[in-house]
Amino acid sequence: QKMIGCIYEVYNEEITKIIENQNTLAVYLVGSSKDVDFTLYDVEINDIDVFVFVKEGEKQERILFKKKGIEFDVNYFSKDGVKKLLSNREYFFVKEMKDAKVLFDRENISHIIKDISRNIYLEGPSKMSLEEKSFIKQDIGAKISNLKNKEKFDVFEYHFLTNLYLKDIIIGYFNINDKWVPKDKKLLKVLKKENNELFELVSKVSENYDYQRLLDVYNYIF
């Protein structure tokens, strides 16, 4: 029973501290934290992600700290920082802000920022020019052609470079199709959802690190 409040108390104490700071304009829960009901006695959570808008401060500052086993990941943004992130169509920012949970909002700006973020997110990233797309294709093509002669490399090095270039190819797929590039740890998960056929080709590469299989992925995309 003692666990009831433990997480809620820690959460409440830290969020209250942030809200009561005179410099704070708005506080949001983002990531998986936004769907959690912290008042439940058996709530399970390891980390709490928070966005804070401030009057004065750096454009963006990230502070990580641990309190009673719970990790807080707090991103502070100044007014200028928020404007800049929106005008740069910064993926991580609009993705989180589009459905952030509002905990505090001194100047009633949340609905506007959330609307703008949602629109940017749905429109997708800035479109690349044909020149840029063609450069990506050539650049990656040149990299992987180095791997043609397997015997030139140590086994470990060959595997390492194959994985490295495979990642470049996958990012290239998102770029040339004018899609948002997911974070590294979400790259394969999103790819599987977007294009299962391509995902299957990608997962075959690591079965035997065959050059032809890497080339198949490249040719499928480009």
Regions found by a protein language model. Give the residues of each.
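Metal-dependent nucleotidyltransferase catalytic core
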Residues: 1-99
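Generic preference for well-ordered secondary structure
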Residues: 2, 11, 34, 49, ...
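Conserved NTP/Mg2+-binding pocket subregion across the NTase superfamily
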Residues: 3, 7, 63-152
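Sequence-level detector for tyrosine residue identity
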Residues: 8-11, 28, 41, 53, ...
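Generic hydrophobic secondary-structure signal
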Residues: 13-15, 27-29, 48-52, 72-74, ...
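Charge-rich, low-complexity amphipathic helices
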Residues: 37-42, 73, 104, 108-111, ...
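Conserved nucleotidyltransferase catalytic core and NTase-mimicking acidic/glycine-rich helix/loop elements
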Residues: 127-222
